[in-house]
Amino acid sequence: DPEEKFPPSNKQALNKLLEVAKKMDIHAELVTEEDAARLMEFDALFIRTTTSLNHYTFRLSQLAKQNGMVVIDDPLSIIRCTNKVYLNELFEKEKIPAPLSMLIFKSNENTFEQISEQLGSPFILKIPNGSFSFGMKKVTNEIELKAALDLLFDKSSILLAQEFTPTEFDWRIGILNGEPLFACKYYMAKGH
């Protein structure tokens, strides 16, 4: 999506991918949502747009998978990876180190004291399907908590609260056919 504000791959990376494909005698081309009608002309779909369940990328991924195409990001991966609540529970189950977390429900009374008692202060509130800091608020006191809850509960009735863990990077792990393909550091933009 050339109009995407925070694309997962820049133009230079996409052009490099096309160069490598050409060297390997693979016909590859960049397609957009407008090319959806041509999807079945291809053998594989490699999505390089930020995916979400209510986005055309998910529908294209489903269509490609249903028609037997190789798909990266496949529909199940999109469902799993765009849901922070699911990922948090998976990390707990598999004993993968992660920031301390707890679920916050709209139907409960939520106070700064009770959350910070478990997670410390400050802490982060996240909607389950946010990305690139969308739907995420850092909370340092009761006033900020109330404002964040008012804003975020308009988007989701369940929030994930996590201890604040300053870091210069996140990890990105690529999985293909259930096997780890790569691990890389995803560095934060300044002021993030």
Label the predicted regions:
Residues 1-100:
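Conserved N-proximal alpha/beta basic substrate-recognition cap immediately N-terminal to
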Residues 99-122:
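Rossmann-like NAD(P)H-binding beta-loop-alpha module
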Residues 48, 104, 186:
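Conserved residues at the C-terminal ends of beta-strands
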Residues 134-192:
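Phosphate-binding site of ATP-dependent enzymes
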Residues 46-48, 89-92, 117-120, 142-143, ...:
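Short, hinge-like loop/turn segments at secondary-structure boundaries
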Residues 2-4, 77-78, 106-109, 128-132, ...:
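Short acidic/polar capping segments at secondary-structure boundaries
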Residues 30, 100, 122-125, 158-162:
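A short linear hydrophobic-aromatic micro-motif
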